[in-house]
A protein has these predicted regions:
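Histidine/acidic-residue-rich, glycine-tolerant segments that coordinate divalent metal ions
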Residues: 21, 50-61
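Zn2+-dependent cytidine deaminase-like catalytic core
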Residues: 1-50, 135, 159, 163-166, ...
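Active-site ligand-binding patch in enzyme domains
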Residues: 2, 56-59, 63-194
């Protein structure tokens, strides 16, 4: 833990924005610092900014689930596609750039097979600079993923969660670099809670 390095370095005062929610640590570092004579001060005003900066970590530690941010584009009347099912750009350039900025912050982008079949999205970050592409995750109960889908060609890794045990299709997807995870629930759908 970092508290040992701080003690060994002879640091006299540590100002923290938030207590580490990791149950393996659970604030024990503060106790060790204080026991070693280090003055520990909490800066509560910076706590919210710290939580926002590390929201995914805090969600995993406190709730045991990843932080999920949903992005959807709809017209003023709440429609996401034309009446014939055709998809078209609803948002303008500024909104798309904002969406890509949020996408760049994500570890993974999740979609369902319906979106892949209807829109054939790329789901990668294109409009902002990023050091890495988020992992693409597709929930596909029946393993309907087309072998020419853009998500299989994207620079980020693609993971497909399915309830299907279709070995030939699994092998074909794996040959294209996808990871296929079979996780059926009792109803034969993908076990999202697992």
């Amino acid at each position: 833990p970092c508290c040992h390095a701080l003690i060994e370095a002879g640091i006299a005062k540590v100002v923290c924005a938030i207590t580490d929610p990791n149950p393996q640590v659970a604030g024990n570092g503060f106790a060790k610092l204080r026991a070693a004579g280090v003055h520990v001060e909490m800066d509560d005003a910076a706590g919210q900014a710290c939580r926002e900066l590390n929201i995914g970590f805090f969600s995993r530690m406190v709730r045991g689930t990843p932080w999920v941010r949903m992005k959807a584009a709809t017209s003023l009347d709440g429609v996401t596609a034309l009446h014939n099912g055709q998809s078209q750009w609803i948002t303008g350039p500024a909104a798309r750039a904002d969406g890509h900025a949020w996408r760049a912050r994500a570890c993974a982008i999740l979609t369902g097979i319906g979106t892949v079949l209807q829109d054939n999205p790329r789901l990668n970050v294109r409009e902002v600079q990023t050091p890495r592409q988020p992992r693409i995750v597709v929930v596909d109960s029946k393993l309907d993923m087309p072998l020419d889908a853009h998500v299989l060609k994207a620079p980020g890794a693609c993971t497909i969660y399915t309830s299907s045990t279709n070995a030939p299709k699994t092998q074909a997807l794996q040959a294209l670099g996808a990871t296929v995870v079979v996780m059926p629930n009792a109803a034969g759908k993908v076990d999202l809670a697992a």
